[in-house]
Amino acid sequence: MQSAILVRHAESVFSALGLATGRADVGCPLSDRGVAQARALGDELAKKGIDLCVTSELERTKQTADIALAGRAVPRLVLAALNDPLYGRYEGGPLAEYVAWAVESDSAAEPPGGGEARQAIVARYAAGFRRIVARPERVILLVTHSLPIAYALLALDGREPAPRLPQVEYAKRYVLERDDVIEVITRLEAWCAAPTW
């Protein structure tokens, strides 16, 4: 990989309602507004050479990629390591309730009901980015979720993670060069090795 274009999926029906939806087996299509956002992303990418498109397992990332790359023969790879978190009992409820729990909890704590600890989520994202940077394709479009992008941007900025992060804008592109992605991986792994958050 030489460069990666990181994009949060377009607005989904559930994200428009502020719901926590991390399970891949729960359908969550784009809203009408999200479809328009994905089309606009496609217009922005129309003249950009893309050698591989990576999505998470979740429907909203795949649908965003399908619309944005319509008519283009871009190979696909589904990478579960870049899925949204598993929220446990907060799944399907207001995201704000999960965030309130996270703010009061240690980063190693698992949400009740089978959710993922934030440390485990960060480790998973680091592994996902490591797989991407090892790919032979030069330009990779990564359609994923707000959290892995937010963590990547924090890492590049040299800041520490926090339980409450601003949402990344829908269908907005962030271009990271190879060295940037390697720095992200290094920092994410360091966060997990010596968690102070």
Residue map of PLM features:
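Phosphate-handling substructures
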Residues: 28-29, 71-125, 165-166, 187
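Glycine-rich phosphate-binding loop signature in dinucleotide/nucleotide-binding domains
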Residues: 46-49, 132-138
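Generic beta-sheet signal
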Residues: 4, 138-146
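Acidic, low-complexity terminal tails and accessory targeting/binding regions
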Residues: 1-2, 44, 77, 85-96, ...
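Short, solvent-exposed loop/turn segments at secondary-structure junctions
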Residues: 11-13, 59-60, 83-84, 146-149, ...
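Short beta-strand scaffold positions
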Residues: 55-56, 123, 143-144
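Active-site signature of alpha/beta-hydrolase-fold catalytic machinery across serine-
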Residues: 67, 151-155
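Active-site-proximal alpha-helix that buttresses catalytic centers in soluble enzyme cores
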Residues: 2-72, 101, 114
